[in-house]
């Protein structure tokens, strides 16, 4: 009997169906040859600092830097039940081999290995590595299982990543929190990302806009413009001089240009375009695409490649046919797809580009949730565009003379729409929901050198130099992807902050912590975010340094760099960070003056509890007690954690309601919600129902 361990319940069910393991048990599915179970994401995590040494429980400068001699792991409180199931299965007498079927990537590898190690399993294990949840792909994957130890280097890179995040995050967070007496959360990747946002806002604020003017000659469909003019009076004078004058074409430069079809989507380019065109956040796009993957409608989403492998030509042709049949509004009749352009095995590392699967022909697309359908259409349109012909146009630039002044005009005439026709059809299918990129005007008039225009129409227009634009999720993802690239060697394996799989979570975490905020499509740093970056030294907020670390992690996964060497560099940096920042900067202490609103006393340590933007948090530096305003338990009962409720919970440890709403029946009921706080500061809630009256006495 073989035990298959997947990352999520939904994936486990898909695999179990293919393997005919359909007998439902508690925490797993059973068949004649296979047991299939799951992890619910990370079941095991690095132990918190206070699990190593007693003196690490207190947040004090003297305890820094905290560098564990031997790393400890702990089972997550919320997943202990499923870990217990997996441990029992891993030690079941009839299990002879384990198959790792977690997501085929760095974090998926870590999720499985930590469970395997924590359970002290000694069984041999193999690796399932697939890029699609289609039945055919799963069956082929099981026919081509690899020895699990072939992915040891990938596991080592995942361990190095998690330990580096712990070292930087724990030490830097405690250091600056202690120095400035304010909870300041610092992260290896999130802090440099925040620094880029703050730097962009500084550039915008410091930008000095300048006014300038352009004079226009309007002649038979041509709009020729002058060079920039600083003074309005000069522009007006030039306009007056041009009235009733003749203009002559001095030069006409025509150039045939070809624009190659776009590449297929990797996760980052998909997230960027979904944000720009459809307004989705990076996390929404990842969630929608992951759901489509689990429904077998698209291939694996967490990829950094924009190509298919050389052996996928036949399958890709089938998928193009499926897309054309399911989305006729985007297809071009009679077009011959160029599949070979999409193939390049050398540019595919772990997973190929994101494309639809042939399973879309078996799906009622109308039954898909709106967001998923839009993402599927976006992925489908990109496949059609990428396999279409070139977009060819004639670029035209002309110089025109009038009253001794030089004017220019430019435009183009389209010779072949090619892939642009598919793109145009996609935009039309969305109407106002998609932002079509601005394009130069087509149908440039036919002009010749020496041609003269009599009595031209003249006008002038006022303009301002433009500051840098605020980051959107689209442009921030691009900045994260390319951060530090200009300072790195040309053949660096990876450049940037984070990975395609983690960038969305980094953005969401910065929002959750109150360091950045969304305003429509813009992403802006908050006052807390600006202040945090202001006090931090360059070494901890440098995108270049973090990009180098990400490159090192990729080299570790390739077996080209030693884990111990990498972590030694991290430890050196953390040690220097602590030694260089022994005292707070006096002028920065004012940034974190206590203007917060107190709401009660902490039930764990008796320190003040303050009202935050999204939570109620303990002010104690060594206490993690927090109540989130969008608490899931309260929301499931039809309530929110407002200030009145929190005051009651903090003072009495319970609050009584007469109008709770059942999540299942939607009926109102009466109960008391009681709060208990664990030693680690985690609040837990339970419902206490009033005693039912057995009967009513008659009163006389």
Where are these regions (language model features)?
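C-terminal or mid-to-C-terminal helical accessory/interaction module adjacent to the motor/catalytic core
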Residues: 93, 137-219, 254-258
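Metal- or metallocofactor-binding catalytic centers and their adjacent structured scaffolds
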Residues: 160, 232-265, 271
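Short strand-coil-strand connectors
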Residues: 30-32, 218-222, 401-405, 665
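Amphipathic alpha-helical transducer elements in NTP-driven molecular machines
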Residues: 9-16, 33-36, 40, 76-87, ...
């Amino acid at each position: 009997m073989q035990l298959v361990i997947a990352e999520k319940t939904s994936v486990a069910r898909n695999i179990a169906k293919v393997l005919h393991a359909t007998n439902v048990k508690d925490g797993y599915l059973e068949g004649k040859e296979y047991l299939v179970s799951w992890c619910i994401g990370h079941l095991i995590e690095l132990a918190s600092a206070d699990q190593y040494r007693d003196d690490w429980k207190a947040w004090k400068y003297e305890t820094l830097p905290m560098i564990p001699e031997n790393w400890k792991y702990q089972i997550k409180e919320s997943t202990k039940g499923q870990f217990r199931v997996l441990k029992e299965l891993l030690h079941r007498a009839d299990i002879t081999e384990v198959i790792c079927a977690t997501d085929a990537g760095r974090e998926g590898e870590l999720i499985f290995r930590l469970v395997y190690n924590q359970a002290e399993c000694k069984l041999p294990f193999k690796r399932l590595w697939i890029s699609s949840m289609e039945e055919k792909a799963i069956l082929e994957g099981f026919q081509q299982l690899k020895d699990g130890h072939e992915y040891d280097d990938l596991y080592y890179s995942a361990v190095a990543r998690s330990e580096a995040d712990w070292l930087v995050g724990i030490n830097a967070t405690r250091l600056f929190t202690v120095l400035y007496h304010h909870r300041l959360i610092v992260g290896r990747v999130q802090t440099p990302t925040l620094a880029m946002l703050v730097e962009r806002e500084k550039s915008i604020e410091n930008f000095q806009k300048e006014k300038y003017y352009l004079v226009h000659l309007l002649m038979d469909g041509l709009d020729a413009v002058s060079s920039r003019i600083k003074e309005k009076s000069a522009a007006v004078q030039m306009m007056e001089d041009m009235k009733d004058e003749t203009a002559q074409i001095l030069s006409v430069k025509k150039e045939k240009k070809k624009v190659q079809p776009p590449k297929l989507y990797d996760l980052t380019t998909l997230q960027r375009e979904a944000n720009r065109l459809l307004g989705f956040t990076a996390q929404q796009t990842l969630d929608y695409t992951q759901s489509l993957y689990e429904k077998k409608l698209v291939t694996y989403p967490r990829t950094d490649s924009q190509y298919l492998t050389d052996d996928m030509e036949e399958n890709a042709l089938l998928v193009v046919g499926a897309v054309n049949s399911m989305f006729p509004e985007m297809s071009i009749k009679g077009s011959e797809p160029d599949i070979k352009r999409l193939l390049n095995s050398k540019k595919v590392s772990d997973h190929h580009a994101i494309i639809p699967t042939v399973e879309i022909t078996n799906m009622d697309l109308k039954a898909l949730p709106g967001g998923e359908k839009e993402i599927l259409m976006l992925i489908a349109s990109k496949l059609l565009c990428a396999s279409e012909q070139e977009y060819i146009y004639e670029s035209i630039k002309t110089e025109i003379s009038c009253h001794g002044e030089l004017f220019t005009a430019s435009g183009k005439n389209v010779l072949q729409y090619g892939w642009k026709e598919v793109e145009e059809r996609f935009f039309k299918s969305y109407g106002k929901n998609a932002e079509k990129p601005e394009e130069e005007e087509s149908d440039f008039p036919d002009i010749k050198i020496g041609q003269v225009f009599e009595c031209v129409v003249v006008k002038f227009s006022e303009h301002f130099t433009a500051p840098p634009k605020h980051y959107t999720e689209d442009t921030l993802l691009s900045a994260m992807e390319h951060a530090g690239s200009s300072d790195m060697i040309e053949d660096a394996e990876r450049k940037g902050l984070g990975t395609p799989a983690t960038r969305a979570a980094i953005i969401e975490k910065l929002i959750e912590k109150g360091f950045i905020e969304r305003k429509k499509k813009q992403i802006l740093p908050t006052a807390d975010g600006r202040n945090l970056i202001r006090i931090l030294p360059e070494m901890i907020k440098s995108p270049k340094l973090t990009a180098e670390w990400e490159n090192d992690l990729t080299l570790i996964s390739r077996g080209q760099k030693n884990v111990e060497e990498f972590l030694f560099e991290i430890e050196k940096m953390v040690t220097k960070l602590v030694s260089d920042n022994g005292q707070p900067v006096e002028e920065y202490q004012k940034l974190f003056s206590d203007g917060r609103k107190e709401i009660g006393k902490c039930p764990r340590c008796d320190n003040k509890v303050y009202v935050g933007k999204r939570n109620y948090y303990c002010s104690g530096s060594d206490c993690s007690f927090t109540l989130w305003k969008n608490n899931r338990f309260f929301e499931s009962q039809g309530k929110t954690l407002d200030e009145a409720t929190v005051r009651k919970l903090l003072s009495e440890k319970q609050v009584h309601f007469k109008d709770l709403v059942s999540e299942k029946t939607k009926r109102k009921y009466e109960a008391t919600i009681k709060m208990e706080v664990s030693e680690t500061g985690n609040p837990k809630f339970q419902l206490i129902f009033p005693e039912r009256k057995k009967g009513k006495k008659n009163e006389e």
